[in-house]
Swiss-Prot record:
E.C. numbers: 4.1.1.39
Residues holding Mg(2+): K192, D194, E195
Subcellular location: Plastid, Chloroplast
Subunit structure: Heterohexadecamer of 8 large chains and 8 small chains; disulfide-linked. The disulfide link is formed within the large subunit homodimers.
Positions with a binding annotation for substrate: N114, T164, K168, R286, H318, S370
The organism's taxonomic lineage, starting at the top: Eukaryota, Viridiplantae, Streptophyta, Embryophyta, Tracheophyta
Name by which UniProt lists this protein: Ribulose bisphosphate carboxylase large chain
Reaction(s) catalysed (UniProt annotation): 2 (2R)-3-phosphoglycerate + 2 H(+) = D-ribulose 1,5-bisphosphate + CO2 + H2O; D-ribulose 1,5-bisphosphate + O2 = 2-phosphoglycolate + (2R)-3-phosphoglycerate + 2 H(+)
GO molecular function, one term: monooxygenase activity
């Protein structure tokens, strides 16, 4: 028989290989697959492997011009999801040669590209990725990392405190700068541009940068502490984004900010490289993440977006609070917090970690807890996140009945009280409220904050459980 065998054949004949032994250089993926009725799970898993690597819907003549065995993705394992009908975890291994070095963009285009619209699947979710050390070494990663940031700021042994300036839209640059100054002067380490503050008619970016720089220098001089404001450099083009980052550096600002999902991984990686070369810290906001990660059976889990950010580069990233107004279950959140901070993370299915991940020498990222948190949450936050974190109170600072600076004082006093209590061996989980009450006796600012928020709770079940 001359030529090749044309026609359509089952994916599983080529792409389902349960006997395959994964290599150290493979990128491994765990997908939650919901096949259409009548599609066997092996075929669905193989289809995912094929469509996200070398396959197409029919045999093509040009397959003969390459070595499919060398380049194809392989579904090497399938397991049913306990408690779910017709859902499976499909494990897929991709040879490293399929991916461009140092490009999160290219990695995602393959692994979570067209395959998510594939008709034979009702739904598909990427739960986790194991990124091999060989691929990690092609990335710069975070511009500075946790230790370098602490050294730059000269702040040790406690979480850092931040505040998002509200109202998020509508303030003039001068009034915005004033709010920044008051918060920093009151005792916060950082203030933050809201993610949707870019350069709007009511406040152009250059004016905001100038007034915020003034606020930073004034509050530094008065407190003797190093201060920062996350200047949001996110823009409509990469060139404009870089222009803003360069201006921030010229002002001597310590940190800039980027919305990495709406801005895109290509822009983010460029900015991260600039930040390392020029000594700027990079704060990352995850606006749009819930569009991708909130549905349990379709999309991509945030732990994958977090890993991708560590590769692309950022020194801080928003990572949920466990206790505030935004989604995040405790064990799952702590799972990806470890993936952001630690050098080596063991597989632990109870926390949603499907693979052991070795980050080799990539710096760590500080998780940022932000969204609906206030002084009564401080003991829980200190206990859950530990020292290497940024705790951000927007309304929880600016909503103080006496104003912004007293709001900042209340948060700083609450934090210092929790850290001291923990260092003295007290149990923050059990004695948290008592610790805050004791501290409020000698801090009228904290007492006023405690009174305002004593009954506020955001209690809904988490949507994204294991």
């Amino acid at each position: 028989s001359v030529g090749f065998k044309a026609g359509v054949k089952d994916y599983k004949l080529t792409y389902y290989t349960p006997e395959y032994e994964t290599k150290d250089t493979d990128i491994l993926a765990a997908f939650r697959v919901t096949p259409q009725p009548g599609v066997p799970p092996e075929e669905a898993g193989a289809a995912v492997a094929a469509e996200s690597s070398t396959g197409t819907w029919t045999t093509v003549w040009t397959d003969g011009l390459t070595s499919l065995d060398r380049y194809k993705g392989r579904c090497y394992g399938i397991e049913p999801v306990p408690g779910e009908e017709n859902q499976y975890i499909a494990y897929v291994a991709y040879p490293l040669d399929l991916f461009e070095e140092g490009s999160v963009t290219n990695m995602f285009t393959s692994i979570v590209g067209n395959v998510f619209g594939f008709k034979a699947l009702r739904a598909l979710r990427l739960e986790d990725l194991r990124i091999p050390t060989a691929y990690i070494k092609t990335f710069q990663g975070p511009p500075h990392g946790i230790q370098v940031e602490r050294d730059k700021l000269n702040k040790y042994g406690r979480p850092l405190l931040g505040c998002t300036i509200k109202p998020k839209l509508g303030l003039s640059a001068k009034n915005y700068g004033r709010a920044v100054y008051e918060c920093l002067r009151g005792g916060l380490d950082f203030t933050k541009d809201d993610e949707n503050v870019n350069s709007q008619p009511f406040m152009r970016w250059r004016d905001r940068f100038l007034f915020c720089a003034e606020a930073i220098y004034k509050s530094q001089a008065e407190t003797g502490e190093i201060k920062g404001h996350y200047l949001n450099a996110t823009a409509g083009t990469c060139e404009e984004m870089m222009k803003r980052a360069i201006f921030a550096r010229e002002l001597g600002a310590p940190i800039v900010m980027h919305d990495y999902l709406t801005g895109g991984f290509t822009a983010n990686t460029s900015l991260a490289h600039y930040c390392r070369d020029n000594g700027l810290l990079l704060h990352i906001h995850r606006a749009m993440h819930a569009v991708i990660d909130r549905q349990k059976n379709h999309g991509m889990h945030f732990r994958v977006l977090a890993k991708a950010l560590r590769l692309s580069g950022g020194d801080h990233i928003h990572a949920g609070t466990v206790v505030g107004k935004l989604e995040g279950e405790r064990d799952i959140t702590l799972g990806f917090v470890d993936l952001l901070r630690d050098d080596f993370v063991e597989k632990d299915r109870s926390r949603g970690i499907y693979f052991t991940q070795d980050w080799v020498s990539l710096p760590g990222v500080l998780p940022v807890a932000s969204g609906g948190i206030h002084v009564w949450h401080m003991p829980a936050l200190t206990e859950i996140f530990g020292d290497d974190s940024v705790l951000q109170f927007g309304g929880g600072t600016l909503g103080h009945p006496w104003g912004n600076a007293p709001g900042a004082v209340a948060n700083r006093v609450a934090l210092e009280a929790c850290v001291q209590a923990r260092n003295e061996g007290r149990d923050l989980a059990r004695e948290g409220n008592e610790i805050i009450r004791e501290a409020s006796k000698w801090s009228p600012e904290l007492a006023a904050a405690c009174e305002v928020w004593k009954a506020i709770k955001f209690e809904f079940e988490a949507v994204d459980t294991l």
